A protein has these predicted regions:
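An active-site-proximal "capping" alpha-helix that borders the catalytic cofactor pocket
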Residues: 185-206
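Post-HEXXH active-site segment of zinc metalloproteases
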Residues: 128-129, 143-183
Length: 355
C-alpha cells in the first residue's frame, strides 16, 4: 500500500525550524498551530536545545516501526520513555504520538503522530488533548537528567518459573510478559515519565495535561464493563472445572495492576510540581469510580507506588535508581506471592555503568 504526502510545510518559530510532513489532510492545520504554540512557549521559558523539529503525521505507525526495527541498534535514541526492544516497539505501535530523538545530539527531534490511534482514542479533534500530548512529547528531551540517564543502565532479569496452578501453564508466558512490562515501567522507566510530566506541568500545560488524564480516566471507567465481562467468562471456566476461584483472582489481580498502577506516573508529577488541586481531582476520580470495581489490593498498592514516585530524586546514579526500583519490585513480588505467584525478578545495573 502506497503512502501519499498530502501536506508539507516549513515554518520558523523563533530560532527553531519546523518541518511538517503529513499523510493526512483533515485536522492537520489546527495541530500545526498547537505545535507552534508549544515550541514558542518552551523555547521562551527554559533551555530549548532544538534548532529544528520534524513533525510527521502518519496514518499509522507501520512505517515508523519498520524503520526503528532496522535502526534501533545503531543509534543512541531515546524514544519517549521506551527502550527499543521488540516488546517496547510493539507497544509503541499503538501510541498516539511519540518523540524520537538522539540523546547524543539534541539539535533536533522528530515528533510522530499516529492518525489512527488518535481517532480511536477520540483525540483527533480535541485541541486540549492534542496540546497535552504534544507538550508531553516535547518535554521528554527537556526532562533528561541524571536519573533518566541512569535508567538506561538498568535491566530487568526475570527467571523462568513454574505456573502457580497447573491450569494456568498455557497462559503463563503471557502473564510473565505482562508482569515484566509492568515492572520495567514502574521500576526502570518511571523517572522518564515522572520528570517529563513534571516539566510539562511546570512549563505551563498543567490544565491541558490534567484534562487529558481526566479524559483517560473516564475511558477507564467506561472499560469497567469489559472487565465485568471478563469476570463472567472466567467464572464460566470455574463452573466447567477449568479454573479455580483462586486462579481467577490471580488473573484479575494481574490485569488490574498492569492497567492501573502506571497511573501513579501521571498523577504524582502534579504533587511534585505543587499542583495539588489537579492531583486531588484525579485521585478522587480513581478512588470513587475505579478502585471500588477492581481487586482490593490495587488501591493500597497504587498508594505505595504513587508515594515512591513523589520521592524519586532527579540526581540518582544507576545504583541508587536500582535501589529505589527494588523497593517497589519487592512490594509487587510480595503481593503476588500472597496470591500464589512466585515471580523471580531482579533489577541489575549493566557492567561499567556509572555508580
Amino acid at each position: 500500500m502506497s503512502r501519499t504526502v498530502k501536506h508539507f510545510s516549513l515554518l520558523r518559530i523563533g530560532a527553531t525550524e519546523l518541518r511538517v510532513i503529513s499523510e493526512v489532510e483533515d485536522g492537520v492545520l489546527p495541530m500545526i498551530q498547537i505545535e507552534e504554540q508549544i515550541i514558542q512557549s518552551y523555547s521562551q521559558q527554559m533551555h530549548w536545545p532544538h534548532a529544528w523539529v520534524m513533525f510527521f503525521v502518519l496514518d499509522d505507525f507501520g512505517p515508523l516501526l519498520r524503520q526503528l526495527r532496522v535502526s534501533a541498534s545503531k543509534a543512541n535514541l531515546g524514544a519517549a520513555g521506551y527502550d527499543l526492544s521488540p516488546r517496547s516497539l510493539e507497544a509503541l505501535g499503538s501510541r498516539p504520538m511519540v518523540n524520537i530523538y538522539d540523546m547524543a545530539n539534541l539539535s533536533g527531534c522528530n515528533i510522530y503522530v499516529n492518525h489512527q490511534a488518535m481517532l480511536r482514542a477520540g483525540y483527533w479533534h480535541d485541541a486540549a488533548a492534542i496540546t497535552g500530548l504534544l507538550a508531553h512529547e516535547h518535554a521528554h528531551p527537556l526532562a533528561e537528567n541524571d536519573t533518566t540517564r541512569a535508567s538506561r543502565a538498568l535491566r530487568l532479569k526475570v527467571e523462568p518459573c513454574l505456573a502457580p496452578f497447573p491450569p494456568l501453564e498455557m497462559r503463563f508466558t503471557q502473564i510473565t510478559g505482562l508482569l515484566a512490562g509492568l515492572v520495567e515501567k514502574l521500576c526502570i522507566f518511571a523517572g522518564r515519565e515522572i520528570f517529563t510530566n513534571q516539566v510539562t506541568i511546570e512549563g505551563g500545560f498543567a490544565s491541558e495535561l490534567a484534562r487529558l488524564n481526566l479524559r483517560n480516566l473516564s475511558a477507564l471507567v467506561d472499560n469497567l464493563a469489559g472487565r465485568q465481562q471478563l469476570v463472567q467468562q472466567l467464572q464460566a471456566e470455574v463452573d466447567r472445572g477449568d479454573l479455580t476461584p483462586d486462579e481467577v483472582e490471580l488473573l484479575l489481580l494481574i490485569g488490574d495492576l498492569e492497567i492501573h498502577l502506571p497511573l501513579a506516573l501521571e498523577i504524582a508529577p502534579f504533587h511534585r510540581a505543587g499542583r495539588s488541586a489537579e492531583a486531588h481531582e484525579l485521585e478522587a476520580r480513581l478512588e470513587k469510580s475505579v478502585f471500588p470495581h477492581l481487586h482490593p489490593l490495587v488501591g493500597p498498592l497504587y498508594a505505595v507506588v504513587e508515594a515512591a514516585c513523589r520521592r524519586l530524586p532527579a540526581d540518582g546514579t544507576p545504583a541508587e535508581l536500582a535501589g529505589w526500583g527494588r523497593n517497589t519490585l519487592d512490594i509487587l513480588v510480595g503481593a503476588l506471592a500472597e496470591k500464589g505467584l512466585n515471580l523471580q525478578a531482579r533489577l541489575l545495573v549493566e557492567p561499567g555503568a556509572g555508580q
